[in-house]
Amino acid sequence: TRTDDKPGVNRNMEMQQQQGGFIGHRPRLASFNRASKQLDREKRPVPSGPDPIHHSIPSHAPQHPPSYGKAPYEDDKSIASPGLSNLIGPPPFLDRY
């Protein structure tokens, strides 16, 4: 059985070697990179177009919501301030009377 075990280990080693071969195939990715470079040339103009539009859209969208939110908040504060002061004001007057 021991001798049998030894061959099994050898088989494992062979499998590992195969994996190494697979890594050797990896260089194919390098060739893909070259193709990607060509695509980059086409890609550059594409993003440049949508980029400005996309920028203007987000800039407008965020600006509107904040201003809207601020307006109501300020109104609430101004209303709350006078309301509280009015409520506090009457009691002293009544007391004086």
UniProtKB/Swiss-Prot annotation:
UniProt-annotated stretches for the region Disordered: 1-97
Glycosylation positions?
50
Q: Which domain of life is it from?
A: Eukaryota
Q: Does the keyword Glycoprotein apply?
A: yes
Gene Ontology annotations of biological process type:
cell-cell signaling involved in cell fate commitment
Task: Tell me the keywords, alphabetical order.
Answer: Developmental protein, Differentiation, Glycoprotein, Hydroxylation, Secreted
Which residue spans adopt a coiled-coil conformation according to this UniProt entry? none
Provide the positions where the record notes the PTM Hydroxyproline.
47, 50
Q: Which GO terms describe its cellular component?
A: apoplast
> What protein family is recorded?
Belongs to the CLV3/ESR signal peptide family.
Designated name of the protein: CLAVATA3/ESR (CLE)-related protein ESR2-C
This protein's species is Zea mays
- Gene name, please? ESR2C
